[in-house]
Swiss-Prot record:
Record: residues binding dUMP: E92, L93, V94, R95, Q103, L104, S105, Q106, R107, R172, R199
Domain ThyX: 7-233
Listed NCBIfam families: thyX
Cross-referenced InterPro entries: Thymidylate_synthase_ThyX, Thymidylate_synthase_ThyX_sf
Name the UniProt record assigns to this protein: Flavin-dependent thymidylate synthase
UniProt subunit comment: Homotetramer.
UniProt lineage: Bacteria, Bacillati, Actinomycetota, Actinomycetes, Mycobacteriales
Cofactor annotation remark: Binds 4 FAD per tetramer. Each FAD binding site is formed by three monomers.
Motif annotated as ThyX motif, chain positions: 95-105
Native organism: Corynebacterium glutamicum (strain ATCC 13032 / DSM 20300 / JCM 1318 / BCRC 11384 / CCUG 27702 / LMG 3730 / NBRC 12168 / NCIMB 10025 / NRRL B-2784 / 534)
Pathways involved: Pyrimidine metabolism; dTTP biosynthesis
PANTHER family per record: FLAVIN-DEPENDENT THYMIDYLATE SYNTHASE (PTHR34934:SF1)
Family according to the record: Belongs to the thymidylate synthase ThyX family.
Enzyme nomenclature, EC number: 2.1.1.148
Length: 250
């Protein structure tokens, strides 16, 4: 029987920063946000902080956002490990081509018992949920039947790994879009801001919006100034969205 899985987003990597020993400059933060500030000051040789209004890291980064110099954000990177996301949502995610992706392979990993992501609109209605889970079970049954038949059909192939791969890549055609996937996503801060600005919008699909909001939460901890302009709101249906006054600056 198909089992439901919930979304999980983890920040597994974020840029560190080692300032050059021979540059006389210091700042009040470490890591990715210090790197962004250093890159900006390197453009204009302002390591001595001549403008008191942008002397702190937070003030400097806010100024970057205000004037639209967001190219500096491309020096800092973050990597997320996302689980409990449907294949249909990952198809939307991979359209953001400035990210780098490594996704669970349905050719090498058996999908016959994988979990499913239930859309919220269906999950909140017991009758619709029962119909949905029945459809998942039927598609899983068809997958396993096809897989067994294909492995038998390919029985003359001496390489067992190749035989299984060829069988899975054909049988997976009947797997539903709701099948859970797992994906590692890496991108610079500018790309993450663009993704959140586009996909945390109330006009985005509910699932990809949830992914974007969860990524934002992780990034607001790792880089509170760079992502602090985004505000998370709860909509009438209980789902969440995020907005920023700088969202049109991407």
């Amino acid at each position: 029987m198909a089992e439901q899985v919930k979304l999980s987003v983890e920040l597994i990597a974020c840029s560190s920063f080692t300032p050059p020993a021979d540059v006389e400059w210091s700042t009040d933060v470490e890591g990715a946000e210090a790197l962004v500030e250093f890159a900006g000051r390197a453009c204009y040789e302002t390591f001595d902080k001549p403008n008191p209004r942008t002397a702190s890291n937070a003030a400097y980064l806010r100024h970057i956002m205000e004037v639209g110099h967001t190219a500096l954000l491309e020096h800092a990177n973050a990597t997320m490990y996302i689980r409990g996301i449907s294949r249909s949502a990952t198809h939307e995610l991979v359209r953001h081509r400035h990210f780098s992706f490594s996704q669970l392979s349905q050719r090498f990993v058996h999908s016959g018992e994988s979990e499913v992501v239930v859309p919220t609109l269906i999950d909140e209605d017991p009758q619709l949920r029962e119909l949905f889970m029945h459809a998942m079970d039927e598609s899983r049954f068809a997958f396993n039947e096809l897989l067994n038949a294909l492995e038998e059909k390919l029985g003359d192939e001496p390489n067992a790994l190749l035989r299984k791969k060829q069988a899975r890549q054909a049988a997976r055609a009947v797997l539903p879009n709701a099948t859970e996937s797992r994906i590692v996503v890496s991108g610079n801060f500018r790309t993450w801001r663009h993704f959140i600005g586009m996909r945390a919008s109330e006009h985005a699909d509910v699932e990809i919006r949830e992914v974007a909001v969860e990524c934002l939460r992780k990034l607001q901890v790792a880089a509170p100034t760079v992502f602090g302009d985004f505000e998370i709101e709860t909509l009438a249906d209980g789902s969440q969205m995020a907005t920023s006054p700088y969202v049109m600056d991407f």
